[in-house]
Amino acid sequence: MSQPKRWDVPKPLATAEARMADGSRIVLRRHGNPRGPRLVISHCNGFAADAYYPFWSLLTDRFDVVLFDLRNHGWNPVGSGEDHHVGTFVEDHATIGRAIDRNFSDKPKIGVFHSVSAQSALIHASRESAYSALVLFDPVVCPPGCRPEDVEKVDKVLGQLGQAALKRRERFASLEEFMERVLRSPGFQLLCPGAPELIARATLRPASNGDGYELCCPREYEARVSLEGPRWARAADLSRVSCPVKIVGSDPTVPFSFLPTVDLREILALDYDFVPDTTHLLQLEQPAECVAAMMPFVERCVTEAF
């Protein structure tokens, strides 16, 4: 994996703070074209939305792009771990949606989410919906109709990821030290050029003691989300979702090295495609192909909404 490219995330056009029901704060960042249709973008467990810049930078010419990091990730301050779980991620969507409308004007919002943010958005949309439509990249879901072997696989690997997160290093002497670990990891071998450095800058902050860098999301918080993941993966009720949904998966034929892909092709109720030759981190591996996979659905939703 060559790493010559450097991605520099631009300064947001505007920022705002959304305060959750328990007092947790989530920073909203606006990029792109304020007069365009609105996309709301978030990330997977332990990451941050800025790490997805190779993907969302392709959308800023036309779309009004609003980013947010899940609570206790990325730009957000770290709060209590007691409320850091998928259930609060689900509840946060409604508050975040209202804060976006209040601070950046009220217009239809298409949610574009990945992994656990996709999982939580789907569960949220089965109760109410802050979004007019959802594009979900490789959501961690095992809805009725999934193959039993997929359910068993997700249960096993989420447990392994949770245990591994508890053993993660929390501090690094430099960004380069973190990047070296990423480059050695089998799960990150398909990343696009420059992505490891971008991940480092998005998921680390200067250490509180002034010595090197530390994880933005504490490892215990990341582990909790993975360990409780199987229960929430089965909680998604696709029959009750209140808005159009497009699911874009990673390649179910590629041996997984980060998180297993659930093969949703046989669930006929879904608008489902996958991006060939990708793993769970597909938006950081083939960003242009991921945009191409979602655009016909987004265009239809924009036409209907506007």
Language-model features: locations:
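Conserved hydrolase catalytic core segment
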Residues: 106-149
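Alpha/beta-hydrolase
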Residues: 169-253
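Flexible "cap/lid" loop of the alpha/beta hydrolase fold
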Residues: 133-171
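Active-site loop/oxyanion-hole signature of alpha/beta-hydrolase fold enzymes
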Residues: 21, 70-112, 116, 292
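Conserved loop-alpha-helix segment in the C-terminal half of the alpha/beta-hydrolase fold
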Residues: 239-278
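Catalytic histidine-centered segment of alpha/beta-hydrolase-like enzymes
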Residues: 278-287, 291
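Conserved HGGG/HGGXW glycine-rich cap/lid loop of the alpha/beta-hydrolase fold
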Residues: 29-78
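Alpha/beta-hydrolase fold catalytic core
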Residues: 1-42, 61-64, 101-105, 299-306
